[in-house]
Regions:
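Structural signature of tandem-repeat unit edges
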Residues: 2, 12, 35-61, 65-85, ...
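Short linear proline/tyrosine/threonine-rich motifs used for host-factor recruitment
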Residues: 6-9, 14-17, 33-34
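Mature extracytoplasmic/luminal segments of secretory-pathway proteins
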Residues: 15, 55-57, 147, 152, ...
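Residue-level detector of alpha-helical secondary structure
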Residues: 18-20, 24-31, 46
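Consensus positions within tandem repeat domains that build extended binding/scaffold surfaces
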Residues: 89, 121-124, 143-146, 168-171, ...
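Acidic-aromatic substrate-binding/catalytic surfaces of carbohydrate-active enzymes
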Residues: 92
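DNA-binding interface regions
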Residues: 241
C-alpha cells in the first residue's frame, strides 16, 4: 500500500496527513460538522449572496462547493461531484416563462445529483419541467418551495433521503404525480403545507422520530386515504393531525 504524506487545510488550520487513520479522522470530523448543523445554519448556506465563481461548460456557476445558477444546461445535467449546496432558485424560472425558459432551462429532462449534496435551497427547482431526478441520501435540508409546481416530474413513489432532517414550507406543493411518500428515521421537522395539493397522493409514512409537523401538510390531497405511522405512536400523531385521525394507521415500516 502506498504511503500517505500530505497536508490539508480544514477550518483555517493546516493538518498533516501521514496515515489512513489521519484521513479517517478528518473525514469523520467533516461528517460530524455537517450532521451538527441546525436548520437555520443549513438554510443560511443556501441564502448567501452570489460571489465570483467558476462556470462549467454549460455556463452553470459554482463557488465554494455550491451550485449558484443553472444557465444553459442541455437535456441531461449532472451537478458536479463535491457540490454540497444547491443555492436558492438555482434551477428556478417563473411561471410565465414555462415553455420558453431562461437560457435553455426548459430543455432539462434529467437532473443528476451527487452524494455530497446536503442542502437544497428555497425555490431551487420551482416550476422546473424536469422529468427525472433522484434525491441522494446525503440531503439533510430541503428549503421552502424547493420542488413546488414541478408537475412534470414523473415520480410516483417519493422515498425521501435517509439523512433528511428538515423539510420547508410548501416544499412539494402541487407535485401532482406523487402517489406515495416515505420519510426516514432522521426526519425532525416537516413545515406547513409541504405536500399541499398533491392530488394523486394516496398514502404517506412518517416515523415517530419527527418532532414538529406544521399545519396542513396534506391539505388538498384529495386521494389521501392513509397516513402510516410507527407502531405505538398514535397519541403523538393525533396531536399533529387532529382533523385526520381517521387516516392514521400504525404499521411496521418493513411492510409498506
Amino acid at each position: 500500500m502506498g504511503k500517505i504524506n500530505g497536508y490539508i487545510e480544514l477550518d483555517g488550520r493546516i493538518q498533516r496527513i501521514c496515515s489512513i487513520e489521519d484521513l479517517k479522522r478528518i473525514v469523520n470530523e467533516l461528517g460530524k460538522s455537517f450532521t451538527d448543523l441546525t436548520e437555520m445554519e443549513l438554510k443560511e448556506l443556501t441564502e448567501k449572496s452570489l460571489p465570483d465563481g467558476d462556470e462549467d461548460d454549460c455556463g452553470c456557476k459554482y463557488s465554494e462547493n455550491q451550485l449558484w445558477s443553472v444557465v444553459n444546461a442541455t437535456n441531461q445535467y449532472k451537478v458536479q461531484e463535491g457540490t454540497k449546496v444547491i443555492h436558492r432558485s438555482a434551477f428556478y424560472y417563473g411561471k410565465y416563462n414555462r415553455g420558453k425558459g431562461r437560457a435553455g432551462k426548459e430543455s432539462i429532462e434529467n437532473i443528476l445529483l451527487p452524494q455530497s449534496l446536503i442542502a437544497i435551497g428555497r425555490k431551487a427547482f420551482r416550476y422546473n419541467i424536469f422529468k427525472n431526478i433522484e434525491l441522494p441520501d446525503s440531503v439533510q435540508y430541503i428549503g421552502d418551495e424547493a420542488f413546488m409546481d414541478c408537475d412534470n416530474w414523473e415520480c410516483e413513489r417519493l422515498s425521501l433521503p435517509m439523512d433528511l432532517r428538515f423539510m420547508g414550507t410548501r416544499a412539494f406543493r402541487n407535485c401532482c404525480k406523487i402517489k406515495t411518500v416515505v420519510f426516514n428515521e432522521n426526519i425532525k421537522v416537516i413545515h406547513s403545507m409541504a405536500f399541499q395539493n398533491c392530488t394523486s397522493l394516496e398514502w404517506a409514512y412518517i416515523p415517530n422520530t419527527v418532532e414538529e409537523i406544521g399545519s396542513g401538510i396534506f391539505d388538498g390531497c384529495t386521494n389521501l386515504s392513509h397516513i402510516y405511522i410507527s407502531i405505538g405512536s398514535r397519541e403523538q400523531f393525533e396531536r399533529f393531525f387532529p382533523f385526520d385521525r381517521d387516516k392514521l394507521t400504525e404499521i411496521e415500516k418493513t411492510k409498506i
